[in-house]
């Protein structure tokens, strides 16, 4: 900002100052159970790049040492990372708020249904992506049946208290 400021000073552009870092977003990997045509990281089932445990430990240390208040987990589908529960458990013990960006259908994949009980236990805030409110549009972008699966999972999350209590936050993003 310091080098560019003289160039924008005459434009009445407001000076930007940064405050302390409070939230970081961490991409746990590019592997995903979906192949969304609009995915900005080109995630998909064939991607192999996943964050390893050593890097996750470095992220946790960074958060503790820099008084980070929230960690926003993303991917691909972050739940696919084999250290997904580990990072949540460690951050929770350090009293760091956890946000998980979820495509919803991952929670119907084999072995993932246990996350429906895991998320509330660790007060994970969920940001669920749904590219549209119509079945035809969602299925066109994400594949046939994705809309119905997403609605099924949303109902299950509601039954676990998400969207029903202030302590279990569920946000839908229209992307």
Predicted regions and their residues:
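Conserved alpha-helical substructure of the radical SAM core
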Residues: 2-75, 79-97, 102
């Amino acid at each position: 900002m310091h080098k560019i400021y003289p160039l924008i000073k005459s434009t009445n552009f407001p000076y930007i100052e940064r405050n302390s870092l409070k939230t970081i977003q961490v991409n746990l990997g590019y592997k995903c159970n979906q192949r969304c045509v609009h995915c900005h990281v080109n995630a998909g089932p064939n991607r192999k790049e996943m964050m390893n445990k050593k890097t996750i430990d470095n992220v946790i240390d960074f958060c503790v040492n820099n008084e980070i208040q929230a960690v926003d987990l993303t991917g691909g589908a972050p739940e696919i990372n084999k250290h997904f529960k580990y990072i949540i458990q460690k951050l929770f013990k350090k009293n760091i708020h956890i946000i998980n960006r979820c495509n919803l259908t991952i929670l119907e994949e084999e072995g993932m249904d246990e996350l429906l009980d895991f998320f509330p236990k660790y007060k994970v805030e969920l940001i669920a992506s749904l590219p549209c409110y119509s079945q035809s549009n969602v299925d066109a972008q994400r594949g046939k049946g994705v809309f119905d699966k997403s609605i099924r999972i949303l109902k299950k999350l509601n039954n676990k208290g998400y969207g029903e209590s202030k302590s279990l936050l569920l946000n839908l993003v229209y992307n």
